[in-house]
From Swiss-Prot:
Assembly: Interacts with the DELLA proteins GAI, RGA, RGL1, RGL2 and RGL3.
Protein name in UniProt: BOI-related E3 ubiquitin-protein ligase 1
GO BP annotations, alphabetical order: defense response; proteasome-mediated ubiquitin-dependent protein catabolic process; regulation of programmed cell death
Keywords associated with the record: Coiled coil, Metal-binding, Plant defense, Transferase, Ubl conjugation pathway, Zinc, Zinc-finger
Lineage: Eukaryota, Viridiplantae, Streptophyta, Embryophyta, Tracheophyta
Signals that turn on the gene: Up-regulated by salt and salicylic acid. Down-regulated by gibberellic acid and methyl jasmonate. Not regulated by pathogen or 1-aminocyclopropane-1-carboxylic acid (ACC).
Reactions the enzyme catalyzes: S-ubiquitinyl-[E2 ubiquitin-conjugating enzyme]-L-cysteine + [acceptor protein]-L-lysine = [E2 ubiquitin-conjugating enzyme]-L-cysteine + N(6)-ubiquitinyl-[acceptor protein]-L-lysine
Gene Ontology molecular function, alphabetical: ubiquitin-protein transferase activity; zinc ion binding
TM region(s), chain numbering: none
Species: Arabidopsis thaliana
Gene name of the record: BRG1
Coiled coil regions, renumbered to chain: 183-212
Broad class of enzyme this protein falls into: transferase
InterPro entries, per the entry: Znf_RING, Znf_RING/FYVE/PHD
Length: 294
């Protein structure tokens, strides 16, 4: 808001004119006093006769000067009275009223300026507070967004770790089940191995019994062969080294259990279709290969 400041003349032209008149009157009075004062004069012996007339003249002149001075003083007093009356008249003149109106307008303008400055200051304060609140909200929003991003990343990491933990738990369960299966299989194999071991021990015991049973037969056959001669040797050989009771082609080398008949060859003894002994028709539980080479 632009305010045009008017320079007010606190002293009117009438004040200046009266002051100049008083000043000129004073100068004139001073000039008359200086003119009436005279100059110093040097008087000799020859001129002593003129002193008395001069003194008398001076006395008369001083009386005239005093009279004129009193007149001037009275004139000055009258002029001062007239000037004071004029000043009083000027104080209540329309010009003084105009000056008072100007002063009131200036005061009003100053009050308006102060009010405008106060209003602008309040507006600026409100704007600064609003801007500060906006910046505070923006900062809080930025901090909140950063915190939310970090929390979201942590939540995603927690979910990922939970999935990984679930996968590991499933893997542990599978490993546990697999371990249990392998343990059961190991126990089954161990039981099978123990059963096979016991069966093998039984077979070995039966083989020992078979060897003990064959030894007297072989000795008797040898004795019979030595006593009967070469004509009866074929029959003894057929008894001792008889062929397979099933195919009749190969030499019997498989002992059938539990009847203990040595009546099958290697091929027939390995067949899964043979379930009974071909000699006594007893159910065959096992078979043992016998090495007939001497």
């Amino acid at each position: 808001m632009a305010v045009e400041a008017r320079h007010m003349n606190l002293f009117s032209s009438q004040y200046i004119t009266n002051r100049e008149c008083v000043k000129s009157q004073t100068n004139m009075n001073n000039g008359q006093q200086i003119a009436g004062g005279g100059f110093p004069v040097t008087i000799g012996d020859r001129n002593l006769q003129y002193i008395d007339p001069i003194n008398s003249f001076n006395k008369s002149e001083s009386e005239l000067t005093a009279i004129s001075k009193r007149q001037r003083d009275s004139t000055f007093d009258s002029d001062a009275l007239i000037a004071s009356q004029k000043r009083r008249a000027i104080a209540f003149s329309p010009a003084s009223l105009i000056d008072a109106e100007l002063v009131s307008q200036i005061q009003q303008q100053n009050s308006e300026i102060d009010r405008f400055v106060a209003q602008q200051t309040e507006t600026l304060r409100i704007e600064l507070e609003a801007r500060q609140r906006t910046q505070t909200r923006m900062l809080a929003s930025a901090v909140q967004n950063a915190i939310l991003k970090k929390l979201k990343a942590k939540d995603e990491e927690i979910i990922r770790m939970g999935k990984l933990n679930w996968v590991l738990q499933e893997r542990v369960k599978n490993l546990y089940v697999e371990n249990q299966i392998w343990r059961d299989l190991a126990q089954t194999n161990e039981a099978t191995a123990n059963n096979l071991r016991s069966n093998l021990e039984q077979v070995l015991a039966q083989v020992d019994d078979l060897d003990a049973f064959r030894r007297p037969l072989v000795e008797e056959a040898d004795d019979a062969e030595s006593s009967c001669g070469s004509c009866d040797g074929g029959d003894v050989t057929a008894v001792v080294n008889g062929g397979c009771k099933r195919c009749g082609e190969l030499t019997a080398s498989v002992l059938v259990l539990p009847c203990r008949h040595l009546c099958l060859c290697t091929v027939c003894g390995s067949s899964a279709l043979l379930r009974t002994c071909p000699v006594c028709d007893m159910v065959m539980t096992a078979s043992v290969h016998v090495n007939m080479s001497s």
